[in-house]
């Protein structure tokens, strides 16, 4: 049980951090100012997200809702199953949820404006980072028996390309025109682009390459990607719901290219996850 203390602390921190974000849900305290690019920016003005933009804060709150009511229960259930019978399937499920939680922690650390619970973000990130490294190291040492189907390869390629389709249209015009991002507001960069284009998309192709070589690490990465895409698809729903509640105007092309893409990917990921839920350790 002592070995599980870091994961218990992670769950508690996820609850506290996400709850602090959800309790910031108040659309009545917004204010405006002129940013460094000469554009008028509307600030949220409430709770820990008071210094974040009125466009971004609802996205953060939608993410917090997904974490508290979807990811945390999954984490608890997976941890209990692993405590009762620690086999390859439960370990893969747990490492996948920890990877998703790490993505969340990184987004908070570098994407949210500095606030009074920043130190909790850092502690959460640190616990997840080192716990995930330890778990992935142990899992990658196992020799799993699995068969990669063409549908798995197609899914990984499609997922990797879809992330580029979702985000590159926002970036390319700024490169060509020498301007900042359209919704840069009071931020200096967009962490989602860094994580999705710099890590998640390449991981799709790395996982495919390793699985073709029958390396166990490829299967571990694939399990992480499947769970991550499922969670992101749910997250897109909660984010969009809070954004609509805030009165934010979301352009139809942006809604289609981002929300719909991730929801479709999530449905495919759920189907693949159900088919690939049983893996055996090779003799």
Regions found by a protein language model. Name each.
Residues 78-134:
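Membrane-interface helix-loop-helix junctions at boundaries between adjacent transmembrane segments
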Residues 57-65, 180-203:
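A loop-to-helix transmembrane entry motif
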Residues 75-80, 132-138, 167-168, 198-214, ...:
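Alpha-helical transmembrane segments in multipass membrane proteins, preferentially the mid-helix core
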Residues 211-224, 231-257:
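Extracellular/periplasmic helix-loop-helix junctions in multi-pass membrane proteins
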């Amino acid at each position: 049980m002592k070995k599980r203390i870091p994961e218990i602390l992670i769950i508690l921190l996820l609850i506290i951090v996400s709850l602090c974000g959800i309790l910031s849900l108040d659309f009545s305290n917004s204010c405006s100012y002129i940013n460094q690019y000469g554009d008028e920016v509307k600030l949220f003005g409430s709770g820990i997200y008071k210094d974040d933009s009125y466009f971004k804060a609802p996205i953060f709150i939608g993410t917090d809702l997904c974490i508290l009511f979807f990811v945390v229960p999954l984490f608890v259930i997976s941890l209990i199953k692993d405590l009762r019978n620690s086999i390859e399937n439960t370990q893969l499920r747990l490492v996948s949820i920890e990877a998703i939680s790490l993505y969340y922690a990184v987004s908070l650390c570098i994407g949210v404006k500095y606030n009074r619970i920043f130190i909790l973000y850092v502690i959460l990130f640190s616990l997840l980072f080192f716990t995930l490294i330890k778990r992935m190291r142990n899992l990658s040492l196992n020799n799993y028996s699995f068969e990669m189907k063409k549908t798995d390869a197609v899914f990984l390629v499609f997922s990797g390309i879809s992330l580029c389709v979702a985000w590159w249209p926002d970036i390319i015009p700024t490169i060509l025109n020498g301007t900042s991002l359209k919704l840069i507001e009071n931020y200096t960069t967009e962490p989602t682009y860094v994580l999705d284009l710099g890590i998640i998309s390449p991981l799709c192709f790395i996982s495919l390459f390793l699985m073709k070589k029958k390396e166990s690490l490829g299967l571990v990465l694939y399990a992480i990607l499947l769970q991550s895409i499922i969670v992101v698809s749910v997250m897109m729903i909660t984010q969009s719901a809070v954004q609509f509640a805030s009165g934010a105007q979301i352009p139809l092309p942006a809604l289609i290219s981002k929300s719909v893409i991730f929801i479709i990917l999530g449905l495919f990921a759920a189907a693949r996850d159900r088919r690939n839920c049983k893996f055996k350790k090779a003799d």
